[in-house]
A protein has these predicted regions:
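A short acidic, helix-capping loop that chelates divalent metal ions and anchors anionic groups
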Residues: 108-113, 207-211
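Active-site beta->alpha N-cap acidic-glycine motif
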Residues: 26-111, 117, 121, 128, ...
Length: 242
C-alpha cells in the first residue's frame, strides 16, 4: 500500500511540476522555452513604448499628440476588430510614423485555441491591416502574452516576429498615473542594472471593446518620456531590435 501511495504522490508531483513549467513557458513574458521571441535590445539606455489593444478613439488620438510633443516613436499592437471599427485612427497611427503590430483579430487566449483558430486570428488581423493601412504587420504580440509552439510557428509562417516585453506597467488595473509611471521606472531601473534595454507594456485600448478608460496610461507616458529623456534614455520601436 505504501508503494502505491508513494507512487501516486510522485506522479502527482511530477504532473504538477509539468503543469507549472508549461504555465511558465506559455505565460511568463520573458520565457523562451517555446522558442525565440523578441524581448529587447542589449543597450540599457534604449526603451520601446508599446501600446496594446487599440485603436481606441480619442484616447489613441491624444496619445499620438503626446508622442509628437516628445518627438517619440512607439509600437502599437492593434486588434484587428478595433481597426475594422476605427480605420481612420489606425491610419493616423501609421501616418505618424509609428510601428504597427498584429495583436490578433479578437484578442483570445491563443495558447488554448486550435491551430486553425490561431491562423484565422493572425491572418485575419493582417488582412484588415492590408485593407486599412496598405501593409501587413511584421511583428506580433500574443494577447495576454499567452502562447504555445503553434502560436509562435504560425506567426513566423505569416512573416511576423513574436514580441513580448520586460517592463509591465500594470495599467489595465484601476491605478493612478503616478503608480503606472512608478511601475515603469522600476522596470527600467531593473533592466539597466542587468545591462539590457526595456520593452514597456502599456495600453491605449482594451480587449473588452472600444471606449476603455486609459487616461492614466497617457499621463504616465508623458511623465516617463520627460523623465527618461532627461536621463539620456532613447526611445525606439521594436524593429530596432530585430
Amino acid at each position: 500500500m505504501q508503494t502505491v501511495v508513494g507512487g501516486a504522490i510522485t506522479a502527482a508531483a511530477a504532473a504538477g511540476a509539468g503543469a507549472g513549467l508549461w504555465w511558465y513557458a506559455a505565460m511568463w513574458p520573458q520565457s523562451q522555452i517555446f522558442g525565440p521571441q523578441l524581448i529587447a535590445g542589449r543597450d540599457p539606455m534604449e526603451a520601446a513604448l508599446t501600446f496594446d489593444d487599440g485603436p481606441n478613439g480619442d484616447t489613441t488620438l491624444r496619445l499620438l499628440d503626446i508622442l509628437a510633443e516628445h518627438d517619440a516613436q512607439a509600437t502599437f499592437f492593434l486588434i484587428g476588430d478595433c481597426v475594422r471599427q476605427q480605420p481612420q485612427i489606425a491610419r493616423r497611427v501609421a501616418e505618424a510614423g509609428h510601428l504597427i503590430g498584429n495583436h490578433s483579430m479578437t484578442h483570445p487566449v491563443l495558447a488554448w485555441q486550435s491551430a486553425a483558430r490561431i491562423r484565422e486570428e493572425l491572418s485575419g488581423c493582417n488582412a484588415i491591416f492590408e485593407d486599412v493601412i496598405g501593409a501587413k504587420a511584421r511583428y506580433f504580440r500574443p494577447p495576454h502574452g499567452a502562447r504555445r509552439p503553434a502560436v509562435l510557428r504560425t506567426a513566423r509562417e505569416l512573416g511576423m516576429t513574436p514580441v513580448l516585453w520586460n517592463v509591465t506597467a500594470f495599467d489595465w488595473n484601476p491605478i493612478s498615473a503616478e503608480e503606472i509611471a512608478g511601475n515603469i521606472d522600476r522596470g527600467i531601473a531593473t533592466n539597466r542594472r542587468k545591462g539590457r534595454g526595456s520593452n514597456i507594456l502599456l495600453h491605449d485600448g482594451g480587449h473588452m471593446g472600444l471606449g476603455q478608460p486609459r487616461m492614466p496610461s497617457l499621463s504616465a507616458t508623458a511623465q516617463v518620456l520627460a523623465k527618461a529623456r532627461a536621463g539620456g534614455m532613447r526611445f525606439v520601436t521594436v524593429d530596432a531590435w530585430g
